[in-house]
């Protein structure tokens, strides 16, 4: 039942809006990750708008579709003044292969290696943003792969086990349905960088009390949890108000 986690949609080509991010500001890249090829985009601020030290946000998207589906979220992060990297997991969009817990770790490692290979990236200024499923590679990267500057999570689950229990009507252990643990509670405990958690108060798919609160309670400092009243699973930026959402993310990446 890993399809419960990986609701991917393959694409032959990406069609991305350019009203906020001009085509001249985005670079497509491909990476080898295990036996798969990973596709993504690096979105770069104009030199005239760069502020040093210059942050980079790695956006780890949710379990549906492909990066094109999340492009409006990339645009919001671009408006914070940071560079943004977004990529597709295996089997999503143009990326090849099949996703699993182990492959997500491999893909996140390949993405970080790519960032560290770029001469225009300050590797002390890398932030991870994980939405829903993307909370796992975001927290894993910060806990195990490098010294991240900070992590932002939005609408993430506590663990695969907890997700199965709250997201289905099947009352059996999650290990019968998922091949991985996806233990975000343990990763939040292990990471040492600042953590900003955003979660909708009206999220019925990943309920706040079961998931966000339990992660926050277990996580070490520094940490901040914001319950966004009225927001459903995908509705945090809208319920916040786009301008306030952008300013809150900007304050986090400028204040650490």
Language-model regions, residue ranges each:
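An N-terminal hydrophobic leader/cap segment in hydrolases
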Residues: 1-32
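Membrane-embedded segments
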Residues: 32-114
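Short alpha-helix in the alpha/beta-hydrolase fold that links the catalytic acid
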Residues: 73, 184, 193, 207-217
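Alpha/beta-hydrolase fold nucleophile elbow
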Residues: 121-132
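Hydrolase active-site cap/lid region
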Residues: 135-193, 238-240
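Short beta-strand/loop motif that positions the catalytic acidic residue
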Residues: 190-192, 197-203
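Acidic catalytic loop of the alpha/beta-hydrolase fold
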Residues: 202-207, 234-235
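C-terminal catalytic histidine-bearing segment of alpha/beta-hydrolase fold enzymes
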Residues: 213-216, 221-256
